[in-house]
Amino acid sequence: MKIIVYSTNTCPICVKTKTLLDKWNLPFEQRMIDEDRALMAEFSKVTNGARMVPQIVIDDKHIGGFSDLTELHMDGFFD
């Protein structure tokens, strides 16, 4: 399973998302859209124009943000 988290340096929910993924022992790739302008275009395309972070992509499918991630976890998606 490939997990990508699009985030920024100033986003507290992004930190919370990364902390939860670490707690759940789920490896992920972090893409900091505020550090690399090329990632902004990718972020917009992959997330269908989402403007808020974090945004999470699992196996090339955009699943949404923090609450969507926790809902997947509660539903047993990562078991």
Where do the language-model regions lie?
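Structural micro-motif
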Residues: 48-56, 66-67
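Thioredoxin-like thiol-disulfide oxidoreductase module
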Residues: 33-50, 77-79
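Non-catalytic interaction surface on structured domains
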Residues: 22-27, 45, 71-72
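Short beta->alpha junction loops/turns
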Residues: 10, 33-36, 62
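C-terminal alpha-helical interaction module
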Residues: 2, 7, 44-45, 73-75
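Residue-level recognition of oxygen-bearing side chains
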Residues: 16, 38, 68
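Non-catalytic, surface beta->alpha helical segment in thiol-disulfide oxidoreductase systems
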Residues: 58-79
